Amino acid sequence: MKKSLFKRLTSMAISTVLLSTSVLGCGSNSGSSADGDNAEYRQVYSEEIKTLNYLKTAETNEFGALANMVDTLVEYDKYGVVKPCLATEWSANEDNTVWTFKIREGVKWVTKDGDEYADVEAQDFVDSLKYVLNNKNESETADIAAGIIKNGEKFYSGEITDFNEVGVKAVDKYTLQYTLEKPAPYFLSMLTYVCFFPVNGKFLEEKGDEFGTDPENILYNGGYVFDTFEPQSSRVYVANDKYWDKDN
């Protein structure tokens, strides 16, 4: 799929975010390196990033930046139409309560230094939702997932404690399945919300409370890596040379 310099923003109210932060939208090349190869992106900003923990934040400027560094199942094209990203294909049952996704093979998680850490797999989406729905983690977007995923609210509230009862599972290494509380033909659009972004469970466990505290404490599978961060000055992103779609 064709990539612009910066992907369109992911948000809980995507149309509002696109209007208010169009500098980062599709087709923008403002702030790119002089050679025009999109190898570096510099962003001047007015709002501070407080966390890179995309599974916890609901701040527009934070997940707006993170959406350029972490790919998820689907994304929007420049016309606002959902298209494949980490999911190559999907299907839903007749009443739109069970959704099955095939995960793109060969996608890499990399560190800030560009070292390969692991492959992106279906389990990464299970692990991320488990984190979001654990009320001890105080995810600001938990209500979105809890309101649509089967038994999500019950797990979040503590009514059930076995996460296997929650409507998400890795059928196999590259097949992911969500089961919903009710029919939701719009579910694809919800998958652009940060609560449905993937995370490598091993890395998340290793980092603990340090996850997302700085660029070294997250992994990247998207087109850019957070290179340098100067508070109240600028952010510098560099192209991820392990990116699965870097040639486009």
Describe these PLM feature segments.
Residues D35-D37, I49-K56, G80-K83, W109-V110, ...:
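Short, solvent-exposed loop/turn elements at domain surfaces
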Residues E47, G64-N68, V81, C85, ...:
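Extracytoplasmic/secreted proteins, especially bacterial periplasmic and envelope-associated proteins
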Residues T88-I144:
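Aromatic- and charge-enriched surface segment that lines or borders ligand/interaction sites
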